From Swiss-Prot:
Family membership noted in the UniProt record: Belongs to the MMM1 family.
Gene Ontology BP, a term: mitochondrion-endoplasmic reticulum membrane tethering
Keyword rRNA-binding in record: no
Gene source species: Candida albicans (strain WO-1)
Primary site of residence: endoplasmic reticulum
HAMAP family cross-referenced by the UniProt entry: Mmm1
Ranges of the Lumenal topological domain: 1-76
GO cellular component, one term: ERMES complex
Name assigned to this protein: Maintenance of mitochondrial morphology protein 1
Subunit text: Homodimer. Component of the ER-mitochondria encounter structure (ERMES) or MDM complex, composed of MMM1, MDM10, MDM12 and MDM34. A MMM1 homodimer associates with one molecule of MDM12 on each side in a pairwise head-to-tail manner, and the SMP-LTD domains of MMM1 and MDM12 generate a continuous hydrophobic tunnel for phospholipid trafficking.
Domain called SMP-LTD: residue spans: 165-395
Location in or out of the cell: Endoplasmic reticulum membrane
């Protein structure tokens, strides 16, 4: 029992000592915390005082620094504005306006196009001295330039003149047929052909032994030419591309006239011989050669210039000479033209009917038929058969306001019928008419 008490007492003593030790440690920790809190508060006070001092210093020095910044900003603004104005003046003077001393007025023409038109053929440049010293080199150069231009066109259009298949031109036949049909309709409705031919025959200067010529029959046909077998070839004679087209027309184009042969010997109107002629073209076929040219590129010799001038003198008497002279001037100026001709192996068939006499009449005299047919063939050969050709100047293709049209819908109206060659026709206005939109 005594040992248990001793152990209990010892244990109690240890517990008490441990509690006291814990209280001491707790107290020491509290004291340390208080000391640390006081140190932190002191540091905060010091920092607060330092911040206040800095703010006071900044408030004292701020007016002086603001004055310096304001002055430097004003200087920069003024200098910047002046520099911008100076740059604008320099740009306007040297880049917008041209130098008046370097501007030399020149005549408008080909020289004005130098430096404006883009020239892509850079390999074909030659000095003026080379062209002036050697004329043959100039011809060779122009020939080479033309050949290279043709080669470039064929290359860029993927056309081989030697192996390319011929074309049918069906679409072109439709367009030509529409045009001819429109011309025939206008001729039937307005009698354009009759009045034109009648005025020509009336105003023509005839020999004394021929009386006035009267029209008896006009037939403008009802069929259309057929163009086919179109192929592009290189013309060796004129050094240009040509379109060769086969043309075939099977139709009846008739012109009938009536006149009188006068016998004025030994006295005027001693005898009168009535003559009636009817000439019909029933068949034409041949190879048409078409090409676009510049009238200044080649030497186009006018085959019948003298006779044309004589013909124009008659027109001058009627008041049309001004237009003819203007046409001559236009031809001298050059420009784009359509050149066409027919091959010598063409086929042209006629039917000539003649009736001579008043009571005892001679019908279809072979000599007269042969004479008229030969004259017509000669007239055609001298104008359209190779090596001669026709040149038709083309109008300008640039869009112009005066050529602008727009469709206008109109009511269908009819006018009193007209009679042409025994056939009555009425004028019909269709809704598809066009008017000038610039009116």
């Amino acid at each position: 029992m005594s040992q248990d008490l001793i152990e209990t007492t010892a244990t109690t003593t240890k517990i008490v000592e441990a509690r006291e030790l814990g209280h001491q440690i707790h107290d020491s920790l509290l004291e340390q915390l208080k000391l640390q809190q006081e140190e932190l508060l002191q540091q905060q006070r010091d920092l607060f005082f330092q911040e206040q001092q800095l703010q006071l210093q900044q408030q004292v020095t701020q007016p002086v620094s603001n004055n310096g910044n304001t002055w430097s900003f004003t200087q920069g603004l003024v200098i910047g504005q002046v520099s911008v104005i100076f740059i604008i003046i320099v740009f306007v003077k040297f880049f917008v306006f041209a130098d008046s001393s370097s501007h030399i007025p020149t005549k408008p023409g080909l020289d004005g196009a130098i430096g404006v038109i883009v020239k892509r053929n850079k390999n074909k440049k030659h000095s003026n001295g080379q062209f002036a010293n050697d004329g043959e080199n100039e011809d060779d150069t122009s020939l080479d330039s033309n050949q290279s231009k043709i080669s470039s066109i064929l290359e860029k259009t993927y056309y081989d003149v030697n192996n390319h298949a011929s074309e049918s031109l069906d679409w072109f036949n439709v367009l030509v047929a529409q045009t001819i049909s429109q011309l025939r309709s206008e001729a039937l409705l307005k009698d354009n052909i009759y009045h034109s031919l009648n005025n020509f025959l009336t105003n023509a200067k005839l020999p004394d032994f021929i009386d006035t010529i009267n029209l008896t029959e006009i037939d403008i046909g009802d069929d259309f030419p057929i163009f086919s077998n179109c192929r592009i070839k290189y013309g060796e004679d004129l050094k240009r591309l040509e379109a060769k087209i086969d043309v075939d027309l099977s139709d009846t184009l008739t012109l009938g006239i009536a006149t009188k042969l006068l016998l004025n010997q030994p006295r005027p109107l001693t005898a009168v011989l009535p003559v009636s002629l009817t000439v019909s073209i029933v068949r034409f076929s041949g190879c048409l050669t078409v090409s676009l040219i510049n009238t200044k590129d080649i030497d186009l010799k006018n085959v019948d210039k003298t006779s044309n001038m004589n013909g124009y003198s008659k027109e001058n008497a009627n008041g049309d000479g001004a237009s003819s002279s203007n046409n001559d001037e236009d031809e001298d100026d050059g420009g784009t033209a359509l050149m066409f001709s027919f091959s010598p192996d063409y086929r042209l068939e006629f039917i000539v009917k003649s009736l001579i006499g008043s009571r005892a009449k001679l019908q279809d005299v072979p000599k007269i038929s042969s004479l008229i047919e030969n004259q017509l063939r000669t007239w055609f050969i001298e104008r359209c058969v190779e090596p001669r050709f026709q040149v038709v100047r083309l109008p300008s293709l640039w869009p112009r306001t005066k050529n602008t049209r727009e469709p206008v819908t109109k009511k269908t109206t009819t006018t009193p019928s007209t009679t042409v060659n025994g056939t009555s026709a009425a004028t019909i206005t269709t809704p598809g008419e066009y008017v000038n939109s610039n009116i």
